[in-house]
Amino acid sequence: GIFGKILGAGKKVLCGLSGLC
């Protein structure tokens, strides 16, 4: 749902900024 999309996008942003992924 909508919340899943928001959480998914947030995880991608955090991964990109932190370089953990």
Swiss-Prot record:
Top-level taxon in the UniProt lineage: Eukaryota
GO CC annotations on file: extracellular region
Cited InterPro entries: Nigrocin (IPR032749)
Subcellular location: Secreted
Keyword Iron: no
Tissue and organ expression note: Expressed by the skin glands.
Name of the protein in its database record: Nigrocin-2JDa
Organism: Odorrana jingdongensis (Jingdong frog)
Organism placement in taxonomy: Eukaryota, Metazoa, Chordata, Craniata, Vertebrata
